[in-house]
Amino acid sequence: MALSLFTVGQLIFLFWTLRITEANPDPAAKAAPAAVADPAAAAAAAVADTASDAAAAAAATAAAAAKAAADTAAAAAKAAADTAAAAAEAAAATARG
């Protein structure tokens, strides 16, 4: 019997989710046995992970701010060019008569 596209889609999603879960296991699940074995090392790893997350967030914020600044500069340049073109057109119309 033929499987419906919906069922095929569900199976693909299931296997895709399982593959991602196996490739990137839950950090909390990995940290629990490590915390029992060596609490100091587990705490240091948690601090390092938090620091890397903070650094990634800061980098993303800086990138967003740079993009916003570039977009603002581009919009200002376009507005200035449009204003200059309108002024030149008005001057030409005045000179014609």
UniProtKB/Swiss-Prot annotation:
The keyword DNA repair does not apply. The keyword Secreted applies. It comes from the Eukaryota. Transmembrane segments: none annotated. One of its GO terms (cellular component) is extracellular region. It is found in: Secreted. One of its GO terms (molecular function) is antifreeze activity. Detected in blood serum (at protein level). Keywords: Antifreeze protein, Repeat, Secreted, Signal. Residues 24-48 form a propeptide. Residues 1-23 form the signal peptide. Contributes to protect fish blood from freezing at subzero sea water temperatures. Lowers the blood freezing point. Binds to nascent ice crystals and prevents further growth. Belongs to the type-I AFP family. This is Ice-structuring protein. It comes from Myzopsetta ferruginea (Yellowtail flounder). The lineage of its organism: Eukaryota, Metazoa, Chordata, Craniata, Vertebrata.
